[in-house]
């Protein structure tokens, strides 16, 4: 019946529902197949599904920070999970299970959460295999990994204020990068964060540098385009305008020159007649145009 068909899952929805993580995280894994980074996406999304396995006891903050700093990536906290995962895999192969538990304790890692992380990864890996999604064996590029993650974090992007260590996020939210982040000391111009946590202020946790150019292709359903200064350009032989592209109010493209004919054909026709035909401001080989100029 009609109601049942309204609730039918799309092919993407059907795949999302099979992955054992939140749909937002599942979306990242599915996007990752286009970017050759399924392995990294599974490691990161399974880590984001659980409480952070890295512990930071109140009385051992400095010691635990030093242990965890080994895994930091100066541009991405998401890649710190990949570094940690690779380290744990190597250690687990080399050590007995008791020695591995002890290692987790001395590295300020919660053993049970590490196991939970590995379990979710294994489940993800199984479903991905059943869906026929190939898993990369070579490490993926930074850009590819973060574009895949971006599909699930579009409402968590931010642009740095020029003179402050603060970011403007979606719908004008203001947040700062969490002090535990590898990006805290040198915050980049644009970031995405895994979550926004409100304590004394709004903090962005698990952050990474992004290029605003990556946002537009994966955010088509959220994009707003505005146009200004439509004007005739002799060299282009067309009406051009300045396009601004925003997502949740953030200017991912501040000013791009575009052909205006598809946007407002009536105005373009009017400007063409006035500038090209009446004023003769046109570079063309059309015979009628040369004849027109002779009549002036």
Model-derived regions, located:
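Extended alpha-helical interaction scaffolds
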Residues: 81-99, 103-107, 113, 121, ...
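Second RecA-like catalytic domain
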Residues: 1-236, 296
């Amino acid at each position: 019946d009609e109601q049942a068909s309204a609730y039918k899952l799309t092919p993407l929805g059907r795949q999302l529902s099979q992955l054992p993580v939140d749909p937002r995280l599942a979306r990242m894994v599915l996007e990752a197949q286009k970017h050759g980074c399924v392995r990294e996406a599974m490691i990161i999304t399974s880590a984001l599904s659980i409480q952070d396995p890295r512990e930071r006891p109140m009385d051992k903050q400095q010691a635990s920070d030093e242990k965890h700093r080994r895994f930091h990536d100066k541009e991405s906290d998401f890649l710190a999970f990949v570094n940690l995962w690779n380290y744990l895999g190597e250690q687990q192969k080399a050590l007995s299970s008791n020695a591995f538990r002890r290692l987790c304790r001395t590295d300020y890692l919660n053993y049970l959460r590490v196991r939970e992380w590995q379990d979710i990864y294994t489940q993800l890996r199984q479903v991905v295999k059943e869906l026929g999604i190939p898993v990369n064996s070579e490490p993926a590029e930074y850009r590819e990994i973060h574009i895949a993650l971006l599909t699930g974090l579009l409402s968590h992007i931010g642009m740095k204020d020029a003179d402050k260590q603060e970011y403007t996020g979606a719908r004008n939210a203001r947040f700062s990068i969490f002090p535990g982040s590898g990006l805290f000391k040198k915050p980049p111009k644009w970031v995405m964060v895994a979550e926004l946590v409100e304590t004394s202020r709004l903090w962005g946790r698990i952050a990474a540098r992004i290029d605003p150019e990556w946002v537009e292709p994966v955010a088509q359903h959220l994009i707003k385009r505005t146009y200004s200064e439509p004007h005739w350009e002799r060299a282009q032989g067309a009406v051009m305008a300045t396009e601004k592209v925003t997502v949740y109010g953030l200017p991912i493209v501040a000013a791009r020159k575009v052909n205006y004919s598809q946007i407002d054909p009536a105005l373009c026709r009017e400007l063409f007649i006035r500038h090209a035909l009446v004023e003769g401001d046109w570079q063309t080989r059309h015979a009628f145009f040369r004849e027109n100029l002779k009549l002036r």
